[in-house]
Structure formats: C-alpha cells, structure tokens
Design a protein with these regions (language model features):
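Short catalytic/ligand-binding loop motif for oxyanion handling, primarily in non-cytosolic enzymes
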Residues: 13-16, 63, 72-76, 104-106, ...
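Substrate-recognition element of Asp-dependent hydrolases with the DxDx(T/V) motif
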Residues: 42-43, 48-79, 84
Length: 117
C-alpha cells in the first residue's frame, strides 16, 4: 500500500492569493490568517480537487490530507476540517491530519509546497 500525504495550503487551496487579498484590503493586519473564516474561505487550486479524487480512486493508495495549523488562528483546526468536508465530503475528514511536525509521519510521498516539510 502506498501512503500519500497532500498538504492543504498552496497545494489543495490557494492560501497565498487569499493572504495577498487580505493584506491589500487590510494593510494594518500583519496576519490575515488570524481573521475568523480565513481558512474556510480559501478557494481550491486549479485541478487540485480532481487530482486528489483520482489518487483516492487508486486501489493501492491511501491518501491523507496533512496540514499544519495556524499559530495565529486557533480556529484554523475547525475551519480546515470544515473546508475538507465541504470540498471532499464527510468521509475524507477521517483522513485529515492537522500537525505542525509533518516529518513525524511515515509515508511514501508528501506533496507539499515547502521542500523542508
């Protein structure tokens, strides 16, 4: 069995664009991700949802969403979980892992926007 971990921010959802948008609208807030509702409102990256769905259809693959929480927004745990349910359905929430230390998990592949994750 192949285990694949997929990051959320800037892999499944467009985190950077939302940060830029918030900074443009609210330049006095240095941490846009601290705003309640920020993570829930993220748009999917083009093609990301379809690609994740194709991976889940493979019989020899286990797919998990592995994402770090925001230290600036304690609601990020709930908002990220709700985002996954909205985009992939309730069952996929069982494959959501929210962890600050991604290197602690054992798997075959990590799809992440940060090389050092």
């Amino acid at each position: 069995m192949l285990t694949i971990y997929i990051d959320m921010d800037d892999v499944l959802c467009d985190y950077s664009s939302k940060i830029k948008e918030h900074k443009h609208k609210n330049p006095d807030n240095p941490f846009p991700q601290s705003v309640p509702g920020f993570f829930r409102s993220l748009e999917p990256m083009d093609g990301a949802l379809a690609a994740e769905e194709q991976l889940r259809k493979k019989t020899n693959v286990e797919v998990y969403i592995l994402t770090a929480p925001s230290t600036k927004n304690p609601l990020s745990y709930t908002e990220k979980r709700l985002w996954v349910e909205d985009k992939f359905g309730y069952e996929m929430t069982h494959n959501l892992i929210i962890c600050s230390h991604k290197g602690l998990l054992k798997g075959n592949i990590l799809i992440d926007d940060h090389a050092s994750a």
